[in-house]
């Protein structure tokens, strides 16, 4: 499977086959045409088709930026990964609709560098769509985000959504952000909108790890 889309003047591509994946981010920077490539266990940055050497801090920053955008774009893909720890919480109502509330964390072994992050998903009890999600993170000083889905559409049978992106003070528990949303405590900071989405279900993985 291959998925491509544009997000904030950057082009993203995900190629996934039998557990192998290659995530790519391409954009024009001051140095030239930049292409970040993140596969199962390797990251590299190309500038004008030449690989450049990166220190560990920059490598992590670029890798996280590439991975996080594609991760959220492809939800709920990968939520059944063996390293995911799931906890069904108390069901809640948001805007008059009933939701299953599921907390997810990642194991230290196989969960990546951000294994301490916490994710919460609100799953509609009627159609089982993820209408809301939240997460806490520790990089760059930490913080929390709450996202409200809109513009849901299916392309080649795969559901894509855009999101209204909210925040509150960084120590607020991600698990309680539904309450903060319902009581108008959150601040809207951006919209997460995917453009020019394309799906090729017949594509095989070209670049092996």
Q: Which sequence ranges carry the predicted segments?
A:
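Short, surface-exposed beta-strand-loop junctions and turns on beta-sheet-rich folds
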Residues: 29-32, 51-53, 138-139, 168
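Short, exposed beta-strand/loop patches in secreted or surface proteins that constitute
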Residues: 11-17, 35-37, 85-93, 121, ...
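N-terminal mature ectodomain segment of secretory-pathway/periplasmic proteins
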Residues: 1-50
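Short, basic/low-complexity N-terminal boundary segments at the transition from targeting/disordered tails
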Residues: 1, 18, 65-73, 122-137
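Short solvent-exposed loop/turn micro-motifs enriched in small/polar/acidic residues
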Residues: 5-7, 29-30, 84-85, 114-116, ...
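Gram-negative outer-membrane assembly/targeting C-terminal domains
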Residues: 195-209
């Amino acid at each position: 499977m291959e998925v491509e889309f544009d997000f904030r003047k950057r082009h993203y591509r995900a190629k996934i086959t039998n557990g192998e994946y290659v995530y790519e981010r391409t954009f024009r920077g001051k140095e030239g045409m930049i292409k970040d490539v993140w596969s199962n266990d390797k990251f590299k940055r190309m500038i004008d088709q030449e690989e450049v050497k990166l220190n560990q801090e920059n490598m992590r920053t670029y890798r996280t930026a590439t991975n996080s955008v594609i991760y959220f774009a492809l939800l709920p893909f990968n939520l059944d990964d063996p390293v995911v720890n799931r906890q069904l919480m108390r069901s809640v109502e948001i805007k008059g609709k009933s939701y299953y509330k599921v907390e997810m964390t990642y194991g230290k072994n196989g969960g990546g560098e951000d294994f301490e992050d916490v994710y919460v998903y609100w799953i509609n009890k009627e159609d089982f769509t993820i209408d809301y999600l939240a997460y806490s993170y520790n990089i760059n000083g930490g913080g929390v985000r709450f996202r409200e889905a809109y513009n849901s559409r299916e392309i080649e049978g795969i559901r894509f959504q855009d999101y209204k992106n909210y925040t509150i003070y960084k120590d607020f528990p991600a698990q309680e952000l539904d309450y903060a949303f319902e009581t108008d405590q959150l601040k809207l900071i951006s919209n997460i909108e995917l453009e020019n989405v394309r799906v090729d279900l017949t594509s095989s993985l070209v670049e092996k790890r």
